[in-house]
C-alpha cells in the first residue's frame, strides 16, 4: 500500500487554468512548452541538466522524458503557478510560470516523476489535496500525461465550481 502525502497548491486553479489555456492552445505550443521545460532543468549548481528529450505517444497517455532532474525550486514552481520564479534565472527560457499549464489541453491529471518523487496533480481537488506525492525511483524526469476524459465544464462541476 502506498503512503500518499498531500501538498497544497494555491490559486483559483480551474478558472485560472481555463483562462490561460486560451493563450496556450495547439500541439505546437504544448510541444514547445515541454521542450522548454527540459531546457530549463538545471543541476543544483546551476549547470544545464537535460541533454535529451523523448516523446512517446501511448494508448493511455503522452510520456515525455528528459535526462535532467527537478530541483526543489522546480517542484515549488509547479505548485505556485504563475509565480514567475524563473525570471531571475537568466539561463532559463521560461519566465512567467504558466507554460506547464499547456499540458491541461490533453490531460486532467498530469504526473511528474523526478528526484525520487512521483507527483500527480489534480486540479479538481481541494487546494490542500491537489498534489499527491509518492516516492518513485527513476533517473531523469518523466511527465506522464494521461489523455483527458472530461471537458473543462465537467471538471468544474465535479469540483463544485459553477462559474
What residue spans do the PLM features occupy?
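Well-ordered, non-membrane alpha-helical segments in soluble/globular domains
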Residues: 154-163
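GHKL (Bergerat-fold) ATPase N-terminal catalytic module, capturing the glycine-rich phosphate-binding loop
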Residues: 1-154
Amino acid at each position: 500500500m502506498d503512503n500518499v502525502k498531500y501538498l497544497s497548491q494555491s490559486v483559483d486553479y480551474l478558472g485560472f487554468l481555463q483562462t490561460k489555456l486560451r493563450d496556450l492552445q495547439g500541439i505546437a505550443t504544448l510541444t514547445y512548452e515541454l521542450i522548454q521545460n527540459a531546457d530549463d532543468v538545471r543541476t543544483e549548481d546551476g549547470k544545464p541538466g537535460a541533454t535529451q528529450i523523448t516523446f512517446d505517444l501511448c494508448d493511455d497517455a503522452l510520456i515525455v522524458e528528459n535526462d535532467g532532474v527537478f530541483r526543489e525550486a522546480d517542484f515549488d514552481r509547479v505548485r505556485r503557478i504563475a509565480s514567475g520564479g524563473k525570471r531571475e534565472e537568466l539561463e532559463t527560457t521560461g519566465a512567467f510560470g504558466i507554460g506547464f499549464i499547456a499540458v491541461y489541453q490533453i490531460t486532467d491529471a498530469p504526473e511528474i516523476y523526478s528526484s525520487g518523487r512521483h507527483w500527480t496533480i489534480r486540479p479538481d481537488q481541494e487546494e490542500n489535496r491537489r498534489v499527491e506525492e509518492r516516492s518513485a525511483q527513476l533517473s531523469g524526469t518523466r511527465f506522464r500525461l494521461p489523455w483527458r476524459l472530461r471537458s473543462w465544464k465537467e471538471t468544474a462541476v465535479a469540483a463544485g465550481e459553477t462559474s
